A protein has these predicted regions:
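Nuclease-adjacent, charged terminal/linker segments that flank catalytic cores
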Residues: 1-101
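Conserved catalytic cores of phosphodiester-cleaving nucleases, focusing on short active-site segments
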Residues: 21, 44, 121-141, 158-163, ...
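Non-catalytic regulatory appendages
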Residues: 67-70, 84-133
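Asparagine-biased alpha-helical interface segments
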Residues: 134-138, 142-150, 195-198
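Acidic, glycine-rich flexible loop segments
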Residues: 149-152, 161
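Mg2+/Mn2+-dependent nuclease catalytic core
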Residues: 176-197
C-alpha cells in the first residue's frame, strides 16, 4: 500500500467503524473530524458551479420537476457551459468563492440538486472547510470532478479532518479488518497524493 496509513485498535461499540474513528479523532486536541464521504466536496462544487449546472442549455431541461440537467454526467457537459464554468474558476482565483458558496448555501437550501445531499451538508462543516482548505486545492479537486462528474463523484474518503488554521486539513478513508480499497477510492487517493493534499 503506497498510501499513508494509520492503524488504530478501538474497542468495538457496535457503531460503524467510520464513526468509531471519527469519535476517536474528535477526542484528540485541535481541529474537528466530520463524516462526509461523497457529500462535502461535490456539494461545495455544486454550490459554486450552480449557474453552470442550471444554465439554460438547449435540451438540458425538458421537465419542470427535473433536479438537474439531462447532460450532467455526459462528457460534453462542461464544453456547453464554458462561460459559467470559467466564471466559477475565476471566483476561486480572485478569492470571492467563499462568499459565493456561503450565499448560495443559504439561498438554495433544500432545493433538489443531484450533487448535493442537504441532510449531510451542514453550515458548520461548510464554514470550517472554507476556512482551512486552500483555494488552489479546491480548484484542483473541482477540475478533477468536472472531468468525469459521474465517476469522480464517488470514491471520496469517509472522513474529513479540519484543523484550526488555513491549510490544516486531511481526508481519511476508513477500512475495518478485511476491508479493501475499491478502485475508485484508490484513484482519489492517488490524485490527492499527486496534488500534495493530505489523505490517508
Amino acid at each position: 500500500n503506497a498510501y499513508p496509513s494509520l492503524q488504530l485498535t478501538l474497542a468495538d461499540n457496535d457503531d460503524h467503524v467510520e464513526y468509531q474513528v471519527m469519535d476517536y479523532l474528535n477526542q484528540q486536541p485541535g481541529g474537528q473530524c466530520f463524516y462526509v464521504e461523497n457529500t462535502l466536496l461535490p456539494g461545495l462544487f455544486a454550490l459554486l458551479f450552480w449557474p453552470a449546472i442550471y444554465a439554460p442549455v438547449s435540451g438540458a431541461f425538458f421537465h419542470p420537476f427535473q433536479s438537474g440537467p439531462a447532460d450532467l454526467f455526459r462528457d460534453y457537459f462542461a464544453r456547453l457551459r464554458e462561460e459559467e464554468i470559467n466564471a466559477a474558476f475565476l471566483a476561486l482565483q480572485n478569492g470571492s468563492y467563499a462568499d459565493v458558496i456561503r450565499t448560495r448555501f443559504t439561498q438554495k437550501q433544500g432545493i433538489s440538486c443531484p450533487l448535493i445531499h442537504w441532510g449531510w451538508l451542514s453550515a458548520d462543516v461548510v464554514e470550517k472547510a472554507l476556512a482551512v482548505i486552500p483555494a488552489a486545492q479546491l480548484e484542483a479537486i473541482f477540475r478533477h470532478l468536472l472531468r468525469d462528474l459521474k465517476n469522480h463523484g464517488r470514491g471520496l474518503p469517509d472522513l474529513i479532518w479540519l484543523g484550526d488554521k488555513p491549510g490544516e486539513w486531511k481526508l481519511i478513508e476508513v477500512k475495518g479488518p478485511g476491508d479493501r480499497l475499491q478502485d475508485h477510492q484508490k484513484l482519489w487517493l492517488e490524485f490527492f497524493l499527486q496534488q500534495g493534499i493530505a489523505a490517508e
